[in-house]
């Protein structure tokens, strides 16, 4: 399958083009060599968003013969996105993500026979692999049965992809809030001011005064002539 995009009449777009468009909000998360730079929760959010975009792209396809190459290339990008989502869920300890991924694997397993008819194998670990010869030669009507807007497989996948993305967003928001709290300076604690110690009252020694003694003085008479 060609990975070259030809712009013009009857434009053919590569699977890499579709993969980049699915990861447009988190472009580097769609690149294998860059995924290690993301946290598990960031990957879960990116993969959930990308899978929802992949579903929207596939369900908007007309599955006509002149768009056969684009349809197949978009399905190849869907397979990569789906596998990325299972990978990020597998490395997460969050039970909600694990449950959503498990449900998606169960749904895909239910359609393993239909997928096999267009050259897509559901592996034991739940991931998907395309078998080139059958994938490129299978009738587009069989692709439509699985990936059109009316297909139950896409409708059910869309539901759990949305849950996966919503949970990833909540986890990333929580991580960012914790990071902000760690970066905030701690409030300065002023030393507690204590009142000066009260002076210890000094004991006053009381000394008894001697009793007053009354002294008698001789009377003096003054004569004043009239």
Indicate where each model-derived feature is located.
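Polar, low-complexity export/assembly segments characteristic of proteins
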Residues: 1-226
